[in-house]
């Protein structure tokens, strides 16, 4: 398995159709032209397991993040990437848990960074996470998480908007 440095990603057009490929490390990479997956691990009390990114991450080190997230590699479907990322980051086989797709988003119709599919995993167990990706984590309600981000706690760029779009009731 290759590292992030040699990940090949599909380039997509405004309709999320594959039009080419690019290496993740290519300086010409524009995130709105690639696909990503994100997932939230949610417990029976409605809390989300929110990890803190490893300090060695090049993007958003030490920041709060989605439970699972990553780029869809070239040739993968969104679901295949979700399965791979859940296994790599949380040591979870998704079919051992209850899970569902939550939403799909376009960067051309939202302020989100990329084309993305968002999933939800259900479990009351705290995951055994990959320490290369994650330095720790905690269970938070969506409201508490949004309050911490609003108060200035470092978070990955799309986290607050994803929580609002997927978990906050319309006001």
From Swiss-Prot:
Gene Ontology BP term (one): nucleotide metabolic process
Domain Nudix hydrolase: 32-162
SUPFAM superfamilies: Nudix (SSF55811)
Residues the record lists as binding Mg(2+): 85, 89
Gene3D superfamilies: Nucleoside Triphosphate Pyrophosphohydrolase
CDD domains membership: NUDIX_DR0079
Organism annotation: Deinococcus radiodurans (strain ATCC 13939 / DSM 20539 / JCM 16871 / CCUG 27074 / LMG 4051 / NBRC 15346 / NCIMB 9279 / VKM B-1422 / R1)
InterPro entries the record matches: NUDIX_hydrolase-like_dom_sf, NUDIX_hydrolase_CS, NUDIX_hydrolase_dom
Origin: domain of life: Bacteria
Signal peptide: none
Listed name of the protein: Nudix hydrolase DR_0079
Record-listed E.C. numbers: 3.6.1.-
Recorded family membership: Belongs to the Nudix hydrolase family.
Modulation of this protein's activity: Inhibited by zinc, calcium or copper ions.
Disulfide bond sites: none
Keywords from the named record: Hydrolase, Magnesium, Metal-binding, Nucleotide-binding
Annotated motif Nudix box, positions: 69-91
Assembly mode: Monomer.
Function as written in the Swiss-Prot or TrEMBL entry: Hydrolase that converts various nucleotide triphosphates (NTPs) to the corresponding nucleotide monophosphates and diphosphate, and nucleotide diphosphates to nucleotide monophosphates and inorganic phosphate. Has a marked preference for cytosine ribonucleoside 5'-diphosphate (CDP) and cytosine ribonucleoside 5'-triphosphate (CTP). Has lower activity towards the deoxyribose nucleotides dCDP and dCTP, and towards dGDP, TDP and UDP.
Cofactor: Mg(2+)
GO molecular function, a single term: hydrolase activity
Keyword Transmembrane: no
């Amino acid at each position: 398995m290759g590292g992030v440095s040699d990940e090949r990603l599909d380039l997509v057009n405004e309709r999320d159709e594959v039009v080419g490929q690019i290496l993740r490390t290519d300086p010409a990479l524009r995130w709105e032209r690639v696909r990503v997956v994100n997932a939230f691990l949610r417990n029976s009390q409605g809390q989300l397991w929110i990890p803190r990114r490893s300090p060695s991450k090049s993007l958003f080190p030490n920041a709060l993040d989605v439970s699972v997230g990553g780029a869809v590699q070239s040739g993968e479907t969104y679901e295949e990437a979700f399965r791979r990322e859940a296994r790599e980051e949380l040591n979870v086989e998704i079919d051992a848990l209850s899970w569902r797709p939550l939403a799909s988003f376009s960067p051309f119709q939202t302020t989100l960074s990329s084309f993305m599919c968002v999933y939800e995993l259900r479990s009351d167990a705290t995951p055994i996470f990959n320490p290369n990706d994650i330095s720790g984590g905690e269970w938070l309600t969506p409201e508490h998480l949004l309050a911490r981000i609003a108060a200035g706690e470092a978070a990955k760029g799309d986290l607050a908007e994803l929580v609002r779009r997927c978990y906050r009731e319309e006001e």
